[in-house]
């Protein structure tokens, strides 16, 4: 039986003789035209350590595809480094790159009539970009995550990239020596791999195991380890079998499997960015999903993993403790996962987890039993109020002061806010407002890790609030609220805030409120004028023109 269901459109018949001529130039033989064509979407790049170790994984996938009797076709996908672009204009390209990656994969797979695709990625937007593409084109596919970085070490402390960001605030506050500042800088990132806490890359890759689109245990492996390359090869073999079975992404990505993915995100204390990305993935798969669904799941799924940024441990510790399968087994036994969901292996999630212990190992402290959860409810909350009629996203667990009412300190760009924090112009009790940074206004919803880390480094993490229509890094923690919708650029209430206005952030009531009377707000709204777009040409201008609101995933189509 032939499994080249799609690629035969480009390789078979008299009219395709010129096509075959070009394939012969690539080393193909006549018998190869009856084999399935498998794309390898290779995200390798020396831009960032997150992607610098992907070539080895792509090579392993290529070899496995050949061994499985199929033809590998390698093409590149772009990336930017969120960590390196953070705090600069370059960060505006981060979320945009999610759309570019999705479009890139769609273009290559559809343009070349590939029968399946192995997506290999590392940095934050690689994961949602790849999954959006798979859900959109609905061609058999699997996600191979590049793997996590190992933790750095300095004077007995484990480090991640967030340690470096927070060191900036500590050093400028005089709370860290020059020696320690440089020590953290040089030792925070000791290997290739994605940022090591339960930040955005590890959040999304972990959730892909629960979604059914990645192999078990693959999300918490360290990039340099041999098991990571072995997992990439096994992923490619599984994908070829999925092509033979005609098992497609939309057979796997369903509303129930997305609920599984979000449940794992809640249980592991994952990134706020997951809210945005799963809205986008669901949209690509044509599944009815909203921010209210996140709140519904938050109320029933506890946080059971003690992971950075708000906890103690990193992804390699989670891997040693049993990985995401151990987390999922606890959730499944508690009735918090849909075990009947199909996975890329052709087996259900419950079947995949059959041999995973029902009790986590006693010699580890990363994964807690359900009845000993760190928090009884999830951490990613949807806040609403007159400052966010369409919703905003916050991490609410672990806050010593879950309610703050204070004067607004208003900034229309990130650099001005960062300078004010580092110059000690932000004081305990203030609420920093960063606006005109939404999908259209930023454009691209840049992440605010630099100012939030500076606040923490200054020792103000529990006493200063920050709200924005932009995003936060997965490494952010504290009294911070992002994804405010409607955004300032379209006239959302956040655009009407004035310096010194009273703002309340209430994590208990899930409230984000500007304490200004309706008549005054109406006066300000009548006087407000939409600013000119920051960009009128290029990819940022294209994105700004097409982007939907944050509460719809900030998608472009």
Swiss-Prot record:
Binding site for Mg(2+): 82, 124-125, 447
GO molecular function: 2 iron, 2 sulfur cluster binding; dihydroxy-acid dehydratase activity; magnesium ion binding
This protein's pathway: Amino-acid biosynthesis; L-isoleucine biosynthesis; L-isoleucine from 2-oxobutanoate: step 3/4; Amino-acid biosynthesis; L-valine biosynthesis; L-valine from pyruvate: step 3/4
EC number(s) on file: 4.2.1.9
UniProt entry keywords in alphabetical sequence: 2Fe-2S, Amino-acid biosynthesis, Branched-chain amino acid biosynthesis, Iron, Iron-sulfur, Lyase, Magnesium, Metal-binding
Top EC category: lyase
Swiss-Prot/TrEMBL cofactor(s): [2Fe-2S] cluster; Mg(2+)
Pfam family, one: ILVD_EDD_N
GO biological process, one term: isoleucine biosynthetic process
Record InterPro entries: DHAD_IlvD/Edd (IPR050165), Dihydro-acid_dehy_C (IPR042096), DihydroxyA_deHydtase (IPR004404), DiOHA_6PGluconate_deHydtase_CS (IPR020558), ILV_EDD_C (IPR056740), ILV_EDD_N (IPR000581), IlvD/EDD_N (IPR037237)
PANTHER family to which the protein is assigned, alphabetical: DIHYDROXY-ACID DEHYDRATASE DAD, DIHYDROXY-ACID DEHYDRATASE, MITOCHONDRIAL
Subunit annotation: Homodimer.
NCBIfam families named among the record's database cross-references: ilvD (TIGR00110), PRK00911.1 (NF002068)
HAMAP family reported in the protein's UniProt record: IlvD
Protein name: Dihydroxy-acid dehydratase
Taxonomic source organism: Burkholderia pseudomallei (strain 1106a)
Gene this chain is encoded by: ilvD
